[in-house]
Amino acid sequence: MFSDTVVELEGVNGEVFNLTTGDQGVYLATDVEGCFYDPPVKVVFEEPGNYPGARYLNHRILKRDITFGVQILQDAKHGERSWLSRDSEWRKAWAFNRPCKLIVTTPDSGTRYLWVSLFESPKVDMKYDPRGNPINLTVMSCISYDPFWYEDDRVFYAKTKTDTRFKPTLFDIPGNWPWEELPKETLTITVDRSVGGLNPTDQYISPKWSVPGSTEKVPEFPWPFPPGVAIPWERAPFTQFVIPDYSFEDDEYANRRLKTPGLIYGENCIINTDRREEQFSSESGSPVWARTNGVRFRNMIPPYTEERTFVIEASGTAAGQLISLRLPRPWTRCWGLE
């Protein structure tokens, strides 16, 4: 039987093992459980007294409990090619509190990876001294807290071409700037099938945006900002953006977009639109999320969505600043489902 699947492991120490070719004398054994196919799922249902059978309510994708073995060769009694040395290098690649990267590459689906950690200590048969055997099976009991296989994120950029910076002191109301009067530039990012599709996976995804803060420091105010001293917002240069939060399943919100808070110097932000996460993370650590007035991103991109053009508005930016859109690629399996 011929297989062109390549399985690799990148350890917590950066060491890479090719478990298919055995480049370090470590080969993947048979009978892998809980790893390559769908993760376990728990269905939630109800059984009303006046209803025949049951009704589906929801389902939850669970962690993966993974068991597999590796065959570690002994090609020399001592040195780097001995079982003792190879087994030691294999163990040093693993940790309980940090994940390894299990990588699977196939001609059909490319490369996908799963984050795995130790769940129990590795086991080796000690009926005989393993240092005297030509080959030993090491059994690995692992856990994958995130059950999805990932491709590398797809990242798309929009670059500002117009200088839309302004002085906040030009406006009548200090600290309160009317969006309609700010100089603005409209940017677009188009994602379609020619670049792999918007979401070709079988899972919902939450886009991540990165937006830049102002390139200008607050006049007559020290940087880094001194703790306990109020920032003079009324004279602080800032950038501001309108970021898409399009719904692909509700026409009422098909063109929903949200305006970010003003971002001053040092507040380059990552916007994670996942409702379960902190949505604004500032480079300076400032709590930008506290200035959103409770308005949150809420829409995800459904599986197998082919294309969309995202329209972004930017104000307060210098020419040449970048706005990025990052799309994760989670899959239920390490191959297929395209």
How does the language model describe each region?
Residues T67-Q71, I103, S141-I143, K208-P212, ...:
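Residue-level recognition of well-ordered beta-strand positions that form the cores
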Residues Y150-A158:
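Short, charged, solvent-exposed linker or helix-capping segments at domain edges/interfaces
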Residues K101-E151:
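Short beta-strand and beta-hairpin "edge-sheet" elements
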Residues Y157-E338:
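Intrinsically disordered, low-complexity segments enriched in serine, threonine, and glycine
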